[in-house]
Amino acid sequence: ICKELNENYLATGFLGGKIGEYLQNKLTQNHINHDFISIKNETRTCINITTPDGKQTEILEPGPSINKEETDLFLKKYTQLLTYTDIIVASGSLPNNLPLNFYGTLTQLATKHHKKFLLDTSGQTLKESLKYKPFFIKPNKDEIEQLTGIKIDSLDTFKDALQSRFP
């Protein structure tokens, strides 16, 4: 999206194995700026299947483990990159061995550097990350229901759910 809008951007994070290599090659072929931390484990894949009647099935592999050295390298790179950007977008679930507050740490670093942190994640990671007050979150209907415990079946219940969690 940033590329299409002619905005400056850089994709970063963790990539490893054949899938990571494939993704980096595709990004390069499509002239998408990137600078990833190489990890020892294989990057996971996520496959979404939509049937003609609109039902969706998601096949989601478990994510790779990230070791302390890889995490430290990323945090160093992230902190350096903060001097070149105004907005950070973090998206997706965390690798299973990173702490639930990892996005919170990234939010704190962004805030310290007067940058806006936008977050698209779900579940306990989202719940934990809210404690750090990211500038923007992008929960979908299911994620709002999970976060608030309120079943959303109309615009009114949607508003009620949001107001109950974010008065």
Predicted regions and their residues:
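Short beta-strand segments
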Residues: 13-14, 37-39, 48-50, 60-62, ...
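Conserved phosphate-binding/catalytic loop of the ribokinase/pfkB sugar-kinase fold
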Residues: 49-84
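Short, small-residue-enriched loops and turns at beta-alpha junctions
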Residues: 64-67, 94-98, 125-127, 146
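Conserved phosphate/ATP/ADP-binding segment of small-molecule kinases
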Residues: 104-167
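Small-residue (G/A/S/T)-rich helix-start motifs and N-terminal tracts that mark the onset
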Residues: 20, 29-35, 67-76, 80, ...
